[in-house]
């Protein structure tokens, strides 16, 4: 699952996902900035503190979103590429998993976001 606009209410959202049988969530991110909202770049199981319960919901942290770079931070193509490079290098050094979010409009052939995405694919190999 991924919540639209990355809007989650912890623990309510996660409890509802568990109730519906969802096993993975990709909403743990900041909409307006890059970075790992939970401080981790590896998936982890949601632990319900209020109920002192281990769950089977795997939270997969999202490192960056196309809209963050383009709309919120107003980065140029080169600035976005530099940011992606730093993030991918950091995740590789930690042995983590780099997950990003790209909207379909970012894949227009002449889009700067498309070029950044292509660079990301090469960098992450």
Residues covered by each model-derived region:
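Active-site-adjacent pocket scaffolds in enzyme catalytic domains
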Residues: 2-91
């Amino acid at each position: 699952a991924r919540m639209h606009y990355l809007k989650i209410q912890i623990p309510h959202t996660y409890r509802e996902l568990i109730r519906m049988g969802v096993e993975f969530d990709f909403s743990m991110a900041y909409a307006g900035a890059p970075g790992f909202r939970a401080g981790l770049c590896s998936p982890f199981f949601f632990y319900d503190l209020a109920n002192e319960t281990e769950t089977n919901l795997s939270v997969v942290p999202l490192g960056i979103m196309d809209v963050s770079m383009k709309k919120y931070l107003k980065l140029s193509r080169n600035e976005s590429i530099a940011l992606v490079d730093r993030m991918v290098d950091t995740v590789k050094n930690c042995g983590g998993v780099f997950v990003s979010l790209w909207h379909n409009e970012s894949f227009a052939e002449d889009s700067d976001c498309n070029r950044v995405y292509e660079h990301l694919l090469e960098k992450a190999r």
